[in-house]
Amino acid sequence: MAVTLGKNNMNIRQAIARVVTGADLSESEMMASMEEVMSGQASPAQIASFITALRMKGEAVEEIVGAVRVMRDKATFIDCGLGPDDILMDIVGTGGDGADTFNVSTTTSFVVAAAGVAVAKHGNRAVSSRCGSADVLEALGVDLSLDPATVARSVQEIGIGFLFAPLLHAAMKHAIVPRREMGIRTIFNILGPLTNPAGANVQLIGVFERSLTTVLAEVLLRLGERRSLVVWGEGNMDEMTVTGTSYIADAHDGRVTSYAVEPEDVGLARAAVADISGGRTPEESAQQVRAVLAGEKGARLDMVLLNAGAALLAAGRVETIVEGVVMARDVVESGAALKKLGQLVAFR
């Protein structure tokens, strides 16, 4: 249970003192502390102490919600003209899982976009693998430097756009040095997927710890998203996996439902971890993405079909993940997913 001081003007020194005792901050207290971090008022030592204390205690739902609100407020908004009934999706992982899989969420984004769901793919360079979404997209020929208006137009005109995090979260610069020097997973790994600058209202989010599935699902309910699936794959993967059990927390209709999925449950073969490994370079990773989108059979394609099936469920295009896998397979076999990649590469 969150501990509330009754005032919203807590400073970061007071917040650190609270958190090291094991007490949770309220949403407003967290917002006040994060405002100091994101505005450059907190020192590197204070930032490091604060996020380490949160990590050791375990970030509470109200703390994450408060941090998300501040980070969203500081971000550069990508206005895709989202109406009240429109769906805008993001497929993203926290990173930090150390699994070194290929670029599953990036590849999945093209399949989902080709199925007719608008995708605002939020991403960065490598965190837990040799090659992050930005690295592989750059190797594929996607221009990472497009201005916000052009990115918004990309989503509107071709149904997919890439939101390069460093260009849209300028206030994060104040936390870069402490994060880099600490070298551990912190609340900032969690915040990235929750702070899509285009305001995506449906998400498939992979997390680096199973316990975070229900926590982030509760956060997404508090933030008012339409529907989101938060997933963790057995073997410590921040995505659904065909190498073991996938655990899902489904935030929908005001509640969180948790369940598990085996690859065989959705008509996919179980695979070895080695079969879904990532490339050693961005160029090698780009070849893997192209091969999957072109329909090359194997565990990598099955990984994408599984995650795309879940994403299509979240977006309301299908009633079950099984149906989503079938739809995703049809999209890939039609050539539409590979064509969608070509459209994004060519977009200016």
From Swiss-Prot:
Residue numbers binding Mg(2+) 2: 238-239
Molecular-function GO terms, alphabetical: anthranilate phosphoribosyltransferase activity; magnesium ion binding
Named cofactor requirement(s): Mg(2+)
Known catalytic reactions: N-(5-phospho-beta-D-ribosyl)anthranilate + diphosphate = 5-phospho-alpha-D-ribose 1-diphosphate + anthranilate
Residues the record lists as binding 5-phospho-alpha-D-ribose 1-diphosphate: 93, 96-97, 101, 103-106, 121-129, 133
Family: Belongs to the anthranilate phosphoribosyltransferase family.
Protein name: Anthranilate phosphoribosyltransferase
Organism from which the protein derives: Desulfotalea psychrophila (strain LSv54 / DSM 12343)
Gene of this entry: trpD
